[in-house]
Amino acid sequence: MADSTLMDRLEALLEAPTDGADAPSLTHLETTLTDGYARALALEAERVRLARQISELAARDGGDAGEQTRELNSLSARLAKADGDLSRLRLVLGALRRRAKAARAATAAA
C-alpha cells in the first residue's frame, strides 16, 4: 500500500543517524517531506469529499433506509480512517520537518 510505504520511508528517515556517512542528505529529507505533504493534501481532499457525501446522503429523502444506513456507516468508517491516517502523518511530518530544519541549519553553519 502506498501509504504504508510512504510512512515507512518517513519513519526510516527519523530513525536514521543525524550525522555521518549514514545520515540522509538534506535533499533526501526535503524530497520525502514533499511526498508526505502531497499525501496530506490528498487525505484532506478525501476527507472533504467523504464529508460532502455523508451530508448529501443524510439529507436525501426516500430510498431504502437500510441501504442508506449501510452507505452512511461505510462513508463514516472511511472518514474516520482518513482522519486517523492524517493525524498520524501530520505527527511524523512535524518530526521530520524539525529534523530537516536542524540539518539545514547545520549545513548553513558548515
Give the residues covered by each predicted segment.
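Long amphipathic alpha-helical coiled-coil segments
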Residues: 86-110
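Amphipathic alpha-helical coiled-coil segments
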Residues: 29, 36, 40-43, 50, ...
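Short E/K-rich amphipathic alpha-helical oligomerization segments
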Residues: 15-16, 20-23, 45-74
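Short, charge-rich amphipathic alpha-helices with coiled-coil/heptad character
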Residues: 7-32
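Actinobacteria-biased recognition of intrinsically disordered, low-complexity terminal regions
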Residues: 1-15, 104-110
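Short charge-dense sequence patches
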Residues: 1-6, 24-26, 34-45
